[in-house]
Amino acid sequence: MFDAGWVPKMATVPRQHITQKKIAEHVQRLGELYPPIPLDSVDRTIKRRWLVARKFGHVIDYLARVELEVDRNVLELLVLLPEADETNKTFYADVWQPQEIQHGLILDRLQQDLGRTAADPHLDVSFGIKILGALAHLKPIQDIAKLMYFLTGASTERQAVIAYNKINRGMQQLGETAISETIITPIKQQEPGHFAFYQMSATAMIQDKVLKPWQLFLTRVMREKSYNLVGTNKMKLYKADMGGVMADLGLDDDLEGYAREVGRVENRLLWAHKQGMEFPPYILKALKESVELYRERLARGLTVAEEFG
């Protein structure tokens, strides 16, 4: 059963109309309240290095890599949203990227303190993004790309919030207070604000009827065909790694409950006409695929290097 007790409640659908002014004010507050976490603010004390590495080493490896891929994410946004407004530019260039890169650097140093290898982020912009970017100067296409970006952001940030809360709970149970209080807690405090930005922005597009019915239809089709879990980058290696993250955090015990948490925003905005559907089926499909790939890896007794090297 999915344990929602430790999952912080995200903002529900706002009843009032979301204006661009409200979104801009939210971005400004994020920048003021949560400056990037300084490396020298971290207490590097680890009481039982071997135990932390055994229980959370793989998860920290994965999250460090994903956070360090923010520079590629920004490049993708420059391709997909060539006419992004000032609020979006401020968010991804002045708030999100500086915060996320520090998360990655801090986690990367932690994993090396645990005796593990440094992160190797995947920084190549995909061919699919480049193709879509070639059409992004057309406003109808850019509007679709923008909604896809907001939905992807909401999904990935929700996954991050759940993971960091699970890790924090685990570190506290291990008595690793330095890691909990000076690494995981500061990081997890910044992620919900990112989620709120994506949720507000996507909701505003639907409320304002920015997309015509044919654009929404195409968005649904593209979302169904292109959905990926955070950090998997459409690669089997990373999909199996993500399956390992879910297993280590105990999220594989109730994949439907996890899918419900991850897919709440797009289920409401894209699939409201499908009454009774709790989450888009493609999210559960992606979760199952990652877990199955991870279990296949375990069954073969292979390391990542042996399997994909």
Model-predicted segments: where are they?
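Non-heme di-metal
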Residues: 2-309
